[in-house]
Curated annotation (Swiss-Prot):
SUPFAM superfamilies in alphabetical order: S15/NS1 RNA-binding domain
GO molecular function: small ribosomal subunit rRNA binding; structural constituent of ribosome
GO cellular component: cytosolic small ribosomal subunit
Name by which UniProt lists this protein: Small ribosomal subunit protein uS15
InterPro entries, alphabetized: Ribosomal_uS15, Ribosomal_uS15_arc_euk, Ribosomal_uS15_N, uS15_NS1_RNA-bd_sf
The keyword Ribonucleoprotein appears for this protein: yes
Protein family: Belongs to the universal ribosomal protein uS15 family.
Organism: Encephalitozoon cuniculi (strain GB-M1) (Microsporidian parasite)
GO biological process, alphabetically ordered: translation
Length: 148
C-alpha cells in the first residue's frame, strides 16, 4: 500500500508469526494474561505498548492467538476504551512537537511543511473517528499556540 505524503510503497520491516496455533511455552494461564491486559488498559497504557509488553515479557508474538481478537477490540469489549484513539493522540503529539519547534525556529521551512502534512493527516483521522462515533462530534485537538 502506498504512503500518504510520499512516493514510497511503505513495506513493513516486521513479519507476523505464520503459525496461528496457541503458544505452548506460556508460563501464565490465559485468564491471568487477560486480566493483566485489562489492568494495563486501566492504567492508560496504549494498545501498541500492551502488545510490545506481551511480546517482550510473556513471549506472545501475536496477541490475537491468546486473546481471540485484537488488543483494541478486547479492551473495547471489556469497557476499557481510551478517550482518544492512540493513532490520533500520537498525531496531536507530533503536531504539538512541530509547533513548539516552530515557535523557536520560525524560518524552518521543512518543519512548516511537515506540520501541514501532519495536520492534514490528523484532521483526516479525526473526521474518520467522528464518523465512527469514537470521539465527540465537536472534538478539537489541543494544540500549542504558534507565535507570530
Amino acid at each position: 500500500m502506498a504512503k500518504m505524503h510520499s512516493s514510497g510503497k511503505g513495506r513493513s520491516g516486521s513479519v507476523k508469526p505464520y503459525a496461528t496455533a496457541f503458544p505452548t511455552w506460556l508460563t501464565k494461564s490465559v485468564d491471568e494474561i487477560k486480566s493483566d491486559v485489562i489492568q494495563m488498559g486501566n492504567k492508560g497504557v496504549p494498545a501498541p505498548d500492551i502488545g510490545t509488553r506481551l511480546r517482550d515479557e510473556y513471549g506472545i508474538g501475536k496477541a490475537s492467538d491468546v486473546l481471540g481478537e485484537s488488543i483494541t477490540r478486547f479492551l473495547q469489549r471489556n469497557g476499557v476504551v481510551p478517550k482518544i484513539p492512540h493513532d490520533l493522540e500520537s498525531l496531536v503529539h507530533r503536531a504539538n512537537t512541530l509547533r513548539s519547534h516552530l515557535n523557536i525556529y520560525r524560518k524552518d521551512n521543512s518543519a512548516k511543511y511537515r506540520l501541514i502534512l501532519v495536520s492534514s493527516r490528523m484532521y483526516r483521522v479525526a473526521r474518520y473517528y467522528k464518523r465512527k462515533m469514537r470521539i465527540p462530534g465537536n472534538w478539537k485537538p489541543k494544540l500549542v499556540e504558534l507565535n507570530k
